[in-house]
Amino acid sequence: MVTVRSLGLNGIGGYEVGVECFLSGGLPAFDVVGLPDAAVREARDRVRAAIKNCGAKFPVSRITVNLAPARLRKEGTLYDLPILLGILTASDELKALPENAAFLGELSLSGQLRPVTGVLPMALYAARSGIRELYVPEENAAEATLAENLTVYGVRDVGQLVRHLRREEPMAPAEPWQPTRQDLHLPDMADVMGQENVKRALEIAAAGGHNVLLIGSPGSGKSMLARRLPSILPDMTHEESMQTTEIYSVAGLTDARSPLVTHRPFRSPHHTASPVSLAGGGTVPRPGEISLAHNGILFLDELPEFDKSALETLRQPLEDGVVTITRAAGSLTLPSRFMLVCAMNPCRCGWYGHPSGRCTCSEAQVENYMRRISGPLLDRIDMHVEVPSVEYDAMRRRTQPESSAVIRARVNAAREIQKARFSGIGISCNAYMTPAMIGQFCDLDPAGERLMQGAFDRMGLTGRSHDRILRMARTIADLEGSEAIRPDHLAEAIQYRSTSILK
């Protein structure tokens, strides 16, 4: 019996799979066991054709392949290559395989290797578990080299790998992928005329990682402003890039030529999105939009039009930064630390409160429209910002609005303050402060205490709202470079908690 080391995926985490191949006498047969899915079972035909087309002899024996551990379901086509190598080694077409080496890849009938998904998390697991060499399809090699302390070989076809293993034509290891400066041309805040108050709110949101709800009539610029928010966010750290790339690798969204995700994600699902497409899951659990927005922005336009059950899936991730998917076979936890940015009209016709008086909705219809969004979800959105219609004078003004670069410089300065504040704590911005941290970093003077108490009683705030206001006030103080939260910082934070929308 021969065992070939390979790897598998459980959510976005890797684990080792032992591909055991046993050749015995009896009628020729080829069985794959160890809880394989349909794609793994189909490997029998791909492997047989690839062996014959690379010039090797397919054994006339009873072949049994076991994928261990058998308790975990094996999915996908990545086991084609280790199954082929196990058969060739068991039939003495190959000598012993290299120690501390793992193999994965899909085969074509001609013996060419095709790329597979989830290579980065598997490579990271391999590097941690003592595997020193990893053989992957050529198109996956750059992604695999993102894992440190691992020698990666990009394999073009079975013939090339067989010659390498026989020491006839040694392959050169893949060069570690080096990131290059990629200037992503994002829409600029300078494109938006007027709306200075809304831009200020978005600057605060970007500086502290706060969630935002934009409410305004059609054409007021809600979507335009939201799509320019990425241009004022700080760059991702290397750790954040690796976390996001792992998720994108599992989802099959990485670029073979530039595998590392270096720009913050901006995900904007349509309002017909299902709960599974948002939260992730399915028969074979995969990351949803919530996880694909990790370290970036999840933008929900026309918020009340989303299915209520889909919106309710946001509640746990907004609090915990992870989404837990439970299935019969077990539970799966995926990272989902994102900024939620939502946009909505104030009523079904969209013109409630507009100076033109064009709204045709009754008060009852307006209230019913607002009730589509649950109070608990709205309570988790830090900032409720009204986006007024743009005035003609603002449209025709000759002065150039502030560019994203200018706003981003202020955001970066505030983030540096937060980075120093939370050094060694494990969070990156004010929005993620725990209640204990709020008590430590959000002290109020007597005037601030009176202001906060008055707002709490008058507005009927919840404990969660209270904490979110203090987090926002801390961010506003950071933007001004102030160590203390002054009453004017607190007053500005309080104004972003709309009560009318919660009625």
What kind of region is each of these model predictions?
Residues 295, 301-302, 313:
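Walker B catalytic acidic pair
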Residues 17-23, 278, 382-385:
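Short beta-strand elements
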Residues 33-44, 57-59, 66-76, 284-285, ...:
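Basic, amphipathic alpha-helical bundle interface domains used for macromolecular binding and assembly
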Residues 214-255, 320:
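Walker A/P-loop
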Residues 214, 300, 343:
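Hydrophobic anchor at the beta1->P-loop junction of P-loop NTPases
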Residues 166-204, 208, 235-290:
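P-loop NTPase nucleotide-binding/switch module
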Residues 1-213, 220-223, 326, 466, ...:
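Peripheral, non-AAA+ core regions of ATP-driven protein-machinery
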